[in-house]
């Protein structure tokens, strides 16, 4: 399947191209985009080992001058120290304002590369080439860039849109099963917040927990529909002043769980899965949706091989304190995205600490 989705943001508009075996032609895709002569690829050693040579050869064949900067894999490297090392390489290779940073990797690589691009020389070109399912359907689209702070996830960052996103679904064949499942958390999220038909199709599928077992046509549909959903939301609200906040479904408590486990116990999608299960339980307690809908959501999360329960070694007080550092806090109140039915959510700051405690207590006792 080849498909192109346009993110409409005026002068910052760009295309998301989904095309199998497209890494071999990446130079052809990028050459018409006025991205300057120099390209600095930012990746991690494992991903670069799989696809670096292919990307470099295609870019060089298209006339680009290419250099590389590698960052160790893992959320623990998503920090300002890693950004400074990207700056050092950019300086060493004399990147100019017309030059391009190219993110070849998952969400961590994309977030850091985008932030470096936003801040080096006050902004240079940025291209996303996501290699994980999570990055393909979520992190590579929308222009959120940044790094973590010891006090919370993604507290340092900027909105900075890429010039282009290239998705080659065939690279998922080398993705570890755990990472594929993590990406499915974001896909399920789109089903809950935006696309009830996608949710139903995931329910009806025989298997959705690995690249090897998922129906290829369903995977094509997942990529196209997820990118379209995010593009539609971002086009209406680039800087999260309203509608875009719904994309944070599952992320409020999910980020807290990730942070309190020092980004070592769960990958991001697993945190989101736990956060969605907890948000669903809160919505049920508030009579926003039914117990049956919560059960449908949690069953789909489990079908994807993802966790639904908060680890029992966390203190409720620590979770509540961490929530106060969430980026969505407004006037001192934590804002939650909560489902009202499959395919629709609302944003509310009327979730009390007592209610959160009641929902968390059974899991933490």
Swiss-Prot record:
NAD(+) binds at residues 107-111, 131-132, 144, 153. Its EC number is 4.2.3.4. One of its GO terms (molecular function) is 3-dehydroquinate synthase activity. Its cofactor is Co(2+); Zn(2+); NAD(+). It is an enzyme of class 4 (lyase). Zn(2+) binds at residues 186, 251, 268. It is found in: Cytoplasm. Its main location: cytoplasm. It comes from the Bacteria. One of its GO terms (cellular component) is cytoplasm. InterPro entries: Dehydroquinate_synthase, DHQ_synth_AroB, DHQ_synth_fam, DHQS/DOIS_N, DHQS_C. GO terms for biological process: amino acid biosynthetic process; aromatic amino acid family biosynthetic process; chorismate biosynthetic process. Keywords: Amino-acid biosynthesis, Aromatic amino acid biosynthesis, Cobalt, Cytoplasm, Lyase, Metal-binding, NAD, Nucleotide-binding, Zinc. Pathway: Metabolic intermediate biosynthesis; chorismate biosynthesis; chorismate from D-erythrose 4-phosphate and phosphoenolpyruvate: step 2/7. It catalyses: 7-phospho-2-dehydro-3-deoxy-D-arabino-heptonate = 3-dehydroquinate + phosphate. Binds 1 divalent metal cation per subunit. Can use either Co(2+) or Zn(2+). PANTHER family: 3-DEHYDROQUINATE SYNTHASE (PTHR43622), 3-DEHYDROQUINATE SYNTHASE, CHLOROPLASTIC (PTHR43622:SF7). Belongs to the sugar phosphate cyclases superfamily. Dehydroquinate synthase family. Catalyzes the conversion of 3-deoxy-D-arabino-heptulosonate 7-phosphate (DAHP) to dehydroquinate (DHQ). This is 3-dehydroquinate synthase. It comes from Picosynechococcus sp. (strain ATCC 27264 / PCC 7002 / PR-6) (Agmenellum quadruplicatum).
């Amino acid at each position: 399947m080849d498909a192109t989705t346009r993110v409409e943001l005026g002068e910052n508009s760009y295309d998301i191209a989904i095309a199998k075996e497209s890494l071999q032609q990446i130079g052809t895709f990028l050459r018409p985009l006025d991205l300057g002569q120099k390209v600095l690829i930012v990746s991690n050693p494992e991903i670069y080992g799989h696809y670096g040579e292919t990307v470099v050869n295609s870019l060089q064949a298209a006339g680009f001058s290419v250099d590389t900067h590698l960052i160790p894999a893992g959320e623990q490297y998503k920090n300002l120290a890693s950004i400074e090392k990207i700056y050092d390489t950019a300086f060493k290779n004399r990147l100019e304002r017309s030059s391009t940073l190219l993110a070849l990797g998952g969400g961590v690589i994309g977030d850091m590369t985008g932030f470096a691009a936003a801040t080096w020389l006050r902004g240079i070109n940025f291209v996303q080439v996501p290699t994980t399912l999570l990055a393909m359907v979520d992190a590579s689209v929308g222009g959120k860039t940044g790094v973590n702070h010891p006090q919370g996830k993604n507290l340092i960052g900027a909105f900075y849109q890429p010039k282009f996103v290239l998705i080659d679904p065939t690279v998922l064949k080398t993705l570890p099963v755990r990472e594929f499942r993590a990406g499915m958390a974001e896909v399920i999220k789109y089903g809950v917040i935006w696309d009830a038909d996608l949710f139903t199709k995931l329910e009806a599928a025989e298997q959705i927990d690995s690249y090897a077992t998922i129906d290829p046509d369903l995977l094509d549909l997942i990529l196209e529909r997820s990118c379209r959903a995010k593009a539609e939301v971002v086009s209406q609200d680039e800087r999260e002043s309203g509608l875009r906040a719904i994309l944070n479904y599952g992320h409020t408590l999910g980020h807290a769980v990730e942070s309190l486990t020092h980004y070592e116990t769960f990958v991001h999608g697993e945190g989101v899965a736990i956060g969605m299960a907890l948000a669903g339980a809160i919505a049920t307690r508030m009579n926003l949706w039914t117990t049956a809908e919560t059960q449908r959501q949690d069953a789909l999360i489990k079908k994807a091989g993802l966790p639904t329960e908060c680890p029992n070694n966390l203190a409720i007080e620590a979770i509540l304190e961490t929530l106060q550092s969430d980026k969505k806090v407004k006037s001192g109140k934590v804002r939650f995205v909560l489902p009202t039915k499959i395919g629709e959510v609302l944003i509310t700051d009327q979730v009390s600490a007592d209610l959160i405690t009641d929902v968390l207590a059974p899991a933490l006792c």
